[in-house]
Swiss-Prot record:
It is found in: Cytoplasm. The lineage of its organism: Bacteria, Pseudomonadati, Chlorobiota, Chlorobiia, Chlorobiales. This is Elongation factor Ts. The keyword Cytoplasm applies. InterPro entries: EF-Ts_dimer_sf, Transl_elong_EFTs/EF1B, Transl_elong_EFTs/EF1B_dimer, Transl_elong_Ts_CS, UBA-like_sf.
Length: 288
């Protein structure tokens, strides 16, 4: 067995976050091979290397900012490595600054924002360079993961940020009565955040995704011993249930388990003599 040095043990600990004794044992078990030691620890469920990679993508904040007239809104995800930094004033202040900059400059994508110059407080650097400077300031890598902008010229925007700023949703609703529709739009934003739909309506769900689900359900039915002549009917039943899970208008309404979102919209329109149509939504969850 090769001699295991304290330096090697420390290097493995720095890489994985695992305790010194476990690192020493891993190196002994793998003949001092660093890579094999990491794999050994992962297999034992003790390694933190994979978790650290996830933390880079999952810690940070979702930030949403809307114009005063609620016609334009931006949602972005800014990542860091630890929750400690994510909750700090330096990080949250920077995230809010980026959202304000994106809204003011009509940025519709991450790339748009990266090319914009920040103010004097951040050295008049472009956002892309400021991210690197901020990394040095907070001691962790910062990354602008994604950004989207929604507009509702003929309606209203609403948003929802879950406590902790790890989950947020922005929704655009077309309506001829925007003031009356604001509360409903807020509920719909909460619906998007909580229920995680992928599209507004059934027709927008990608055909290839539907076909993939159908094939999975078909194979499941056959594996359950269902007769071939009944399989198609079973598949369609399960596809309809799938739509109820991923299509916003077909989901169960979070504030009334006996109602569908489509029914809530219909009731609102009748009661308020209004036209309401969900135009688009964006949902960001840290690391997702």
């Amino acid at each position: 067995m090769s001699q295991i040095s304290a330096k090697d043990v420390k290097e493995l600990r720095d890489t994985t976050g695992v305790g010194m004794m476990e690192c020493k044992k891993a190196l002994e078990e793998t003949g001092g091979d660093m890579q094999k030691a990491v794999e050994y620890l992962r297999k034992k469920g003790a390694a933190m290397a994979a978790k650290r990679a996830d933390r880079e993508a999952s810690e940070g904040a979702v930030c949403i900012l809307m114009s005063d007239d609620q016609k334009t809104g931006v949602i972005l995800e800014l990542n860091c490595e630890t929750d400690f930094v994510a909750r700090g004033e330096v990080f949250t202040g920077f995230a809010n600054e980026l959202a304000e900059l994106a809204l003011a400059n009509n940025c519709e994508s991450r790339e748009d924002l990266l090319a914009i110059n920040l103010g004097e407080a951040y050295g008049n650097e472009k956002v892309e360079d400021a991210l690197k400077s901020m990394t040095g300031k907070v001691g962790e890598k910062l990354e602008l993961k994604r950004l989207a902008m929604l507009k509702a010229e003929d309606g209203v925007l609403e948003s929802y940020i879950h406590p902790g700023s790890q989950l947020g949703a922005l929704i655009a609703v077309e309506t001829d009565k925007p003031e009356e529709t604001k509360a409903l739009a807020k509920d719909l934003a909460m619906q998007v955040a909580a229920a995680s739909p992928i599209e507004v309506g059934r027709d927008a769900v990608p055909a290839e995704l539907v076909e993939k689900e159908k094939e999975i359900y078909r194979q499941q039915a056959l594996a359950e011993g269902k007769k071939e002549e009944f399989v198609d009917k079973i598949v369609m039943g399960r596809i309809n249930k799938y739509y109820q899970e991923v299509v916003l208008t077909e989901q169960t309404f979070i504030k009334d388990q006996n109602a569908r979102v489509s029914g809530v919209l219909d009731d609102f329109m009748k009661k308020n003599q209004a036209q309401v149509k969900i135009k688009a939504f964006v949902r960001y969850q840290l690391g997702a």
